């Protein structure tokens, strides 16, 4: 279990991309 700012940002970006679709 490892959570880093980068990981969180990546998830946020992925969500944004899905929303953009």
UniProtKB/Swiss-Prot annotation:
The modification Sulfotyrosine is found at residue 6. Cleaved by the protease thrombin to yield monomers which, together with fibrinogen alpha (FGA) and fibrinogen gamma (FGG), polymerize to form an insoluble fibrin matrix. Fibrin has a major function in hemostasis as one of the primary components of blood clots. In addition, functions during the early stages of wound repair to stabilize the lesion and guide cell migration during re-epithelialization. Was originally thought to be essential for platelet aggregation, based on in vitro studies using anticoagulated blood. The keyword Flavoprotein does not apply. This is Fibrinogen beta chain. Keywords: Adaptive immunity, Blood coagulation, Coiled coil, Disulfide bond, Glycoprotein, Hemostasis, Immunity, Innate immunity, Pyrrolidone carboxylic acid, Secreted, Sulfation. Heterohexamer; disulfide linked. Contains 2 sets of 3 non-identical chains (alpha, beta and gamma). The 2 heterotrimers are in head to head conformation with the N-termini in a small central domain. The modification Pyrrolidone carboxylic acid is found at residue 1. It comes from the Eukaryota. It is found in: Secreted. Conversion of fibrinogen to fibrin is triggered by thrombin, which cleaves fibrinopeptides A and B from alpha and beta chains, and thus exposes the N-terminal polymerization sites responsible for the formation of the soft clot. Signal peptide: none annotated. A long coiled coil structure formed by 3 polypeptide chains connects the central nodule to the C-terminal domains (distal nodules). The long C-terminal ends of the alpha chains fold back, contributing a fourth strand to the coiled coil structure. Its main location: secreted. It comes from Cervus elaphus (Red deer). The gene is FGB.
